[in-house]
Amino acid sequence: ASYSPGFALFILGGTGCRKSTAIGLALSYFGAFHAKNLPASFDDTSNTIRKKAFILKDCPIVVDDYHPETSLQERRRMESIAQSLSRAFGDGTDRGRLKADLSLREAMPPRGVAVMSGEDMPNIGDSGTARFYVVNVGQQDVPITEELTEAQEMAKRGVLRRVMRGYIEFLQPRADRLSKQLETRWLKLRAQAIKETQGAHKRAPEALAHIMLGYSMMQDYLVSVGAMTDEEANADFLDAWRVLVENSTEQGKEAREERPSKRFISAISELLVNQTVTVKDLSIHSATAEKGMIGYVDADYYYLLPEMSYTTVSRLYSDQGMTFPLSKRLLFRQLRDDGIIVPDADGKTTKSKSVGGKIVRLLWIPRRFLDGDT
């Protein structure tokens, strides 16, 4: 088909929830894998992982174990890998690089799909995390049951690999017409996903369509060999679709809460509450700036000093070993576009205000955003 996957699956769950067990079992359709011998991990270098992703054509590559780190250097190393991989799998591209003689090195873009796992989400900004389709795994979601043990025994005996071989043999005689059929089915699934995932990230419908396309094709094979009936396949498809729609919608809500604009407002609010910074009441104080002052307030608005407020939040992030994900200019645009600040008549992000007899340009923020009334 003409539409390649533009996402990586990210399995998110705390230690001990057996997410690697589930991933290893799924990967057993492609080889002799289990939780302890997955193809790659975040302890590998970015170049190593990308080379493996190029070699594993038409196969999933698992990158396991993104975990919290007390070492700032190690945390940033893993974040850099996550950022690199999100771009590579989200865009299907490879970085342009030169050889020692300055000639172009052959590109090695990913040629399969990626499954990553971690105890935490990488701090790689809006754009980076948007390329992940996140599945949360709770402590009780992968229980140790007879069914799990039986599935692991089947994987160990190579049963799952034989199922995948049968599926590929099922596809082979259909290869000439598959491209058009897959494209038509994918477009239909995406259109339906767009209707049903209002509020989700714009990338979510495409990811959902790709996942369900693969799911439905495997169902076609299982029906053809009598492993399930058409009625069972339809019921399972609708159930899986419902779960993915709900997950996509929830992921969209979480992403909005993690937008830099929301994080900026949350940081300012916290700094005001703990009195690390202050604002002057325009009905009482003059315009004289004091240490820790980041703006002004009246009955309706907070008026933040643009440079001071941005620098203060950036410093807060730096003190926590993080980098605020947007430049000042892009942040203010996002605040405007999200309806958090009131722009001037020309759409500029700062607006004139008379303070102590002087006209200054400030960020106008309705009080409800910082006082916790939204």
Where are these regions (language model features)?
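Conserved helix-loop functional segments at active or binding sites
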Residues: 1-4, 28-41, 68, 88-96
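Conserved nucleotide-sensing/catalytic segment adjacent to the nucleotide-binding pocket
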Residues: 48-100
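Residue-level preference for the first positions of well-ordered beta-strands
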Residues: 6-10, 60, 113
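AAA+/SF3 P-loop NTPase mechanochemical coupling elements
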Residues: 54-56, 98-116
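Ser/Thr/Asn(+Pro)-rich, low-complexity disordered segments
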Residues: 36-50, 94-100, 132-134, 138-144
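Short glycine-rich substrate-engagement loop in P-loop NTPases that contacts/grips substrate
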Residues: 25-60, 76
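Extended alpha-helical interface modules used as scaffolds for assembling large macromolecular complexes
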Residues: 73-77, 86-92, 104-108, 113, ...
